Amino acid sequence: MARGPNRRRVDRVPGERRRRLARAMALALPSILALAALGGAATLGWRVGWKSDLLRVREIRFEGLSRATPQELLDLSPVQPGDHLLFLDTDAMAAALRRHPWIASAQVRRTFPPALEVQLAERRPAALVDLGGLYLVDDRGEVFKRAVPGDGLDLPVITGIEREAWAEGRGELAPLLGGALALLGRWSARGLDARSTISEIHVDPEYGTTLWSDEGTEIRLGQGDLEEKLTRLHRVLSALDAEGERAEVLHLDNRRRPDWVAVRVAGRRGEPDGRSSYAAGGGGGPQGRSSSLR
């Protein structure tokens, strides 16, 4: 005998669904409320952080300055006091500061209370180079600014490089400039600066290097064998000092006899100059007004 539908079962289904939905809502409600709270807190934090002065840069501190001034750097900087600490670009600021001719490197760091700490390294000028005007060159061989009286620097001058040639072929001429700077370094390391200070270095790709001292002595080094030539030069200057002599010209550029030093000697100290001549050969020390040394 067939039975009709179970009305009690059918009637019970909607009630079970409502109870399941209620249980699910009860379980999910804490998570929903937590997410809402976090969203509200984030929105509030954003508004407070952005609109309030709590995270505004109060100070920009520059460290490592000697030549550049804080105001010059602030004029270059895209970041200023009052900018928001969290949304400024420290890399862009560092790049802008490096456009100052004296600045070699810059690192920007956020600090709290809201401020910026900028660590700077300035260029170290090693010489002047004549490029149709005097320019400063640093110890890495980079020409970085035109020299002005306010720089207050007494540096040797590198000559022999034409401005037009430098502008067109800097890469080809850079070794000449680098060689002159290396010579200055070796001159100082050998203690020669205590005997004679270099005032000018003339570089020539064909004939090599010629120096002039503050006393007016011309020193023709030529090309190659720098260390050996400086050793011989040191020995010659010591011998001249012992004899009370001063050289007008020293030749260390004899390609046929590279181990020789030809000296044109000026007058003895206290005596007038002009009684000197070039020597073609000789012994081991200054003799009279001229000599050749090995």
From Swiss-Prot:
> Which source organism does the UniProt entry give?
Anaeromyxobacter sp. (strain K)
The record's PROSITE patterns line, in alphabetical order, gives: POTRA
According to the UniProt record, where is the region Disordered? 266-294
Keyword terms: Cell cycle, Cell division, Cell inner membrane, Cell membrane, Membrane, Transmembrane, Transmembrane helix
The family classification in the record reads: Belongs to the FtsQ/DivIB family. FtsQ subfamily.
Please give the function described in this protein's UniProt entry.
Essential cell division protein.
Membrane spanning residue stretches: 27-49
Concerning InterPro entries, the annotation shows: Cell_div_FtsQ/DivIB_C, FtsQ, FtsQ_C_sf, POTRA, POTRA_FtsQ_type
Q: Which residues lie on this side of the membrane: Periplasmic?
A: 50-294
- Residue ranges annotated for the POTRA domain, each copy included: 55-123
Please name the HAMAP family in this protein's record: FtsQ_subfam
What Gene3D superfamilies does the database record attribute to this sequence?
Answer: Cell division protein FtsQ/DivIB (3.40.50.11690), membrane protein fhac (3.10.20.310)
Gene encoding the protein: ftsQ
For this record, an example GO cellular component is: plasma membrane
Q: Which GO terms describe its biological process?
A: cell septum assembly; FtsZ-dependent cytokinesis
Chain ranges on the Cytoplasmic side, renumbered to this chain: 1-26
Mostly located where?
Answer: membrane
- How does this protein lie in the membrane? Single-pass type II membrane protein
Q: Where in the cell is it found?
A: Cell inner membrane
- The chain's coiled-coil residues are none
Please report the name of this protein according to its UniProt entry. Answer: Cell division protein FtsQ
